[in-house]
Swiss-Prot record:
The keyword Acyltransferase applies. Keywords: Acyltransferase, Cytoplasm, Lipid biosynthesis, Lipid metabolism, Phospholipid biosynthesis, Phospholipid metabolism, Transferase. Disruption phenotype: Accumulation of neutral lipid droplets with marked increase in absolute triacylglycerol levels in leaf mesophyll cells. Belongs to the peptidase S33 family. ABHD4/ABHD5 subfamily. It comes from Arabidopsis thaliana (Mouse-ear cress). It holds the Pfam family Abhydrolase_1. This is 1-acylglycerol-3-phosphate O-acyltransferase. InterPro entries: AB_hydrolase_1 (IPR000073), AB_hydrolase_fold (IPR029058). GO terms for biological process: cellular response to hypoxia; fatty acid homeostasis; lipid homeostasis; phospholipid biosynthetic process; phospholipid homeostasis; triglyceride homeostasis. A motif (HXXXXD motif) lies at residues 379-384. Residues 121-251 form the AB hydrolase-1 domain.
């Protein structure tokens, strides 16, 4: 009996000892874990101190782009609706490249629509290469007073979806933009509208009007790209330049589809600084007209960075549409005689796009055509001189808008009809 009680007490002592050891071990592990966590946080804090904000990578995505867009458009007075309009996946068996994808990624076009008076004509605005619809921020309020303004980001740009770019020819690349725009039109149930395109957006707008003239009431091409081919131009200088080592390198980069956006992405944390230097110089110190305010410059820079740094998609069209030197592979000049839509060309006086291309096109066109040059404006005439630009647009559309304002029927002083 005594031996039994002794054995029982011995087992109890062993269990108590194990429990104490286990508790001590658990506490030790917990303490070690807490210490490790504290050390990690301290290391992160020291890293943040040692690694300045200027060297930290700034993330981007479609959500960041839309947020930057909303901040930029917050300075406007006219209410608007922003939506991502689904354009589907195309008809079964479609041979159009932009319909094809190995993923189930949705296709949508980022769209902003501004409030307008009942019965106002619809004006659809299409941005140029390397831009997005927010670039028209200085124009929306004024134009929305006379039009139902709708601005879009083309497929693969801005806040629109960015599918993998699989085009391998000029025809496929044109279809990427023209046919996706047509699917957007169907989704929006638009039958007739005035179509305005800037730069590369002008090229797309003109090609769309050639294919679907029944939907376009009037075509407005602002500093439009794509009128001249290398063979049409006095390109002796380009031939000589290509023969130099610099020309050979740049031509190789072009044919390799090296885009400005790739440079912004490749610079990582230095990318925003590069964009800031560009917007500050182009729309500030070196502005052709009215420079941006400090607030406008800050908001536009943030917006431009996010649109450029996002996934590469539509930007990869460059080498398929243009050859080195920005000469069109399928120039609009060659199809000018086929145009069925009345057209107005608008150029800044200092636009690097040569308005003589429009002059030559007009000689072959069988529809009404006007060419307007706006003073104090460069390639981004709608930012440089918004008042002059608005006058040119209203004059171009004088037959579609109400006649209650006589100044819409004439150009402001300084604007020139060519």
């Amino acid at each position: 009996m005594n031996l039994s009680r002794f054995a029982s007490r011995l087992r109890m002592a062993e269990e108590i000892s194990k429990t104490k050891v286990g508790s001590s071990s658990t506490a030790s592990v917990a303490d070690s874990s807490a210490a490790a966590s504290a050390a990690t946080n301290a290391a992160k804090s020291r890293w943040k101190i040692l690694w300045p904000n200027s060297l930290r990578w700034i993330p981007t995505s479609t959500d960041y782009i839309i947020a930057a867009e909303k901040r930029l458009l917050s300075i406007l007075k006219t209410p608007y609706v922003q939506e991502q309009v689904s354009i589907g996946s195309g008809p079964p068996g479609s041979k159009i490249r932009w319909f094809r994808s190995t993923s189930n990624e949705s296709r949508y076009i980022n769209t902003v629509t501004f409030d307008a008076k009942e019965g106002a004509p619809t004006l659809v605005m299409v941005h140029g290469y390397g831009a997005s619809q927010g670039f028209f921020f200085r124009n929306f309020d004024a134009l929305a007073s006379r039009f139902r303004v709708i601005a879009i980001d083309q497929l693969g740009w801005g806040g629109s979806s960015r599918p993998d770019f699989t085009c391998r020819s000029t025809e496929e690349t044109e279809a990427w933009f023209i046919d996706s725009f047509e699917e957007w039109r169907k989704a929006q149930n638009l039958s007739n509208f005035i179509l305005l395109g800037h730069s590369f957006g002008g090229y797309v707008a003109a090609k769309y009007a050639l294919k679907h003239p029944e939907h376009v009431q009037h075509l407005i091409l602002v500093g439009s790209a794509g009128f001249s081919a290398e063979a049409d131009a006095k390109s002796e200088w380009l031939t000589k330049f290509r023969a130099t080592w610099k020309g050979a390198v740049l031509n190789h980069l072009w044919e390799s589809n090296f885009t400005p956006q790739k440079l912004v992405r490749g610079l990582g944390p230095w990318g925003p600084g590069l964009v800031n230097r560009y917007t500050t110089a182009r729309f500030g110190a070196h502005s052709e007209g009215t420079g941006l305010t400090e607030e406008e410059a800050k908001l536009l820079t943030d917006y431009v960075y996010h649109t450029l740094a996002a996934k590469a998609s539509g930007e990869l069209c460059l080498k398929y549409i243009f050859s080195f030197g920005a000469f069109a592979r399928k120039p609009l000049l060659q199809s000018a005689s086929e145009w069925k839509v009345p057209t107005t060309f608008i150029y800044g006086m200092n636009d690097w796009m040569n308005y003589q291309g429009a002059v030559e096109a007009r000689k072959s066109m069988k529809v009404p055509c006007e060419i307007i040059r706006v003073p104090q404006g460069g390639h981004f005439v709608f930012i440089d001189n918004p008042i002059g630009f608005h006058s040119a647009v209203l004059y171009a559309c004088r037959k579609f808008i109400s006649q209650d304002s006589s100044h819409d029927q004439q150009l402001l002083d300084g604007l020139r009809l060519v």
